[in-house]
Amino acid sequence: MQHAPEPGESQSEDSDDSVSDNDDDEEDAQPTSNAYAALLQSLSTVAKQNEHQETHRRKKRKLAGEDLQVAEEPQQKINRNMSNLTEDEPDAVFDGDALDEDPQEDAASDDGVQIRDAVEETQDGFESFEVHFANPDENDLAMRLRRISENQWSAKKLHAAGGRALLQVPCADNTAFDTRKLRSTRDVQLKARLAENAQKVVGQFNDGHEQVIMPSIFGYQDVLFAARTVHNAARMRDITCLHALNHILIGRDRVLKNNAKLAAANDGDDVEYRDQGFTRPKVLFLLETKQACVRVVDSITRLFTFEQQENKKRFLDQFHRPDQAFSDDKPADFRELFEGNDENEFRVGVKLTRKTLKFYSTFYNSDIIFASPLGLRRAIETGDPKKRSGDYDFLSSIEMVIMEQADANLMQNWEHAEFVFEHLNLQPKESHGCDFSRVRPWYLDDNAKHVRQTIVMSAFLTPKINTLWNKHMRNFFGRLKYTPDYSAGVIESLSHGIKGIKQTFWRFESPSHLTDPDARFKYFSSTILPSILRTPKPAEGGPGILMFVPSYLDFTRLRNSLVDVNISYALISEYTDMTDVRKARSHFMNGKHSLLLYSGRAHHFHRFNIRGVKRVVFYGVPENPIFYEELVSMVGKSVERGETSRAEASIRVMFSKWERMELERIVGTKRLSRMVGDKGDVFDFVY
């Protein structure tokens, strides 16, 4: 089981990925802005070095007051765009052998039938793609981008069974909130090659959250879905994979169709098609474990029937581990996250042709990139020793990001996720064989980050995920946030002998979020710790006080402060050796240690069922409400075993006004305002 490394810690593994090669792409644009001129000038030297020295047909265009000579032999351009395999000089290859690819094989697989499909399926059949990516209205786009820069969002609450949905659009026109109801995949504009399998795999959309969020997902709005569960995870995975595949196929077929038109054009025809980006990769899946990657690939292969899957065995050998399973006494969410291959440093590129799914394609030659935030950061930072700042050009044209388990990534190092988002859709440093005459204008104007669709799924919402929403989910089409209904809170559904045990919530004053750790420690030292020291030791066993500390920084601070306190205690953190863990649990259970300091990440990675717990003190409210249930149930089990009485057992929770989201999930929405805003600072619950 992999723990999150500290910023300087390494967790390398077998070669499982590939990162770079010069590549061509499938997105378009006409250079009509100063930004384009500046970008082209900065890259012209590199571009000229990569061009073949052959006789070219020349076409002249007017660009920002200058004549730009674009020299390309038509058939060479067509082959390059269809196969995206002009690998002039590999920039870097990460972790093992990137596989050689044959341009002729690729062109043959895509050429005939796929061009016919592209011609048969009219571009007008995919309205969302057309107005969002292909031909957005310039005036409307400019207006929306201006409102985004001023943080002006019009908002509307949507009716959502079992949850709350907020739709925001950077537009004052109320018609922007109008959406088409989607009852099943038949109501979604899908490529013909996906429609039948989509109906079999996904079919009808349910009347709960799916009816609310599907128009935003398939309408290319950003979506923050903070209601992911073990039960709906597979379904949400199938839906997002369907959307990603559809997006790739629409864009690819459009490029092939335009290639055919260019090939048929006469020398004097002034034709241009803006249908590409700077580089080929279009979809980025940010996943937590290798096993999660296997599940996504499985979903993709059920939705699209490939005649061949190249290097699939190698992929399964490195990513799939069916023999690693846990017993049923571990909770379902833990098993879903950690069963199978739970390694959390990986990245792998995948390329789609009409008949073949190719694993381990170089990043610049891939349509989809699967990666963990840690693995992708490692690739960017260490990929090419010649580039001191790292290579991230392969992320310049990402049009869709799907982050499947943001809550799990919080328990790793969230800085890795922030790092990845900071490096998305930046202007490339090199040309990578790009045909600038076909790059879309909003790429050249550095607006790709506002056109990109970002879909983030999480079991719950946190301030860090909210920051991601505010900073990186700024789609010009709008954004939707969906959260579950917490009207009751988990406190009303506790079991395992909790009935009759007092649960006390202590609010302390915290004037600033930045100084909250200091205020929390001061309150603990002056109020909570003295009461712990006064706890009488029973005739048999010990007081059984477990202190749960969500933050590792707080854990370290408490550990250091207890050195000078007259109390016997044990420590369990995510970095504690398993031998020491067993010793700490044993001494705590038999009463040798009165206090057990227990970190939030230790519980996340191991979900220990600790014996001898008679009292729990929460140094902070756990972000995951399941943790609260599990820790409180340890007290209930001690009561059921007769190790303590209901009168002696207790639950105490420290909280401040900065923990509203965490507190709401525990006590429920109806109690939240009173507990945060009332004059009183102690709140007792007994069920």
Swiss-Prot record:
GO terms for biological process: maturation of SSU-rRNA from tricistronic rRNA transcript (SSU-rRNA, 5.8S rRNA, LSU-rRNA). Residues 1-111 are annotated as: Disordered. Residues 11-29, 86-109 have a biased composition (Acidic residues). One of its GO terms (molecular function) is U3 snoRNA binding. It holds the Pfam family UTP25_NTPase-like. Keywords: Nucleus, Ribonucleoprotein, Ribosome biogenesis, rRNA processing. Residues 30-48, 76-85 have a biased composition (Polar residues). Signal peptide: none annotated. Belongs to the UTP25 family. DEAD-box RNA helicase-like protein required for pre-18S rRNA processing, specifically at sites A0, A1, and A2. Component of the ribosomal small subunit (SSU) processome composed of at least 40 protein subunits and snoRNA U3. This is U3 small nucleolar RNA-associated protein 25.
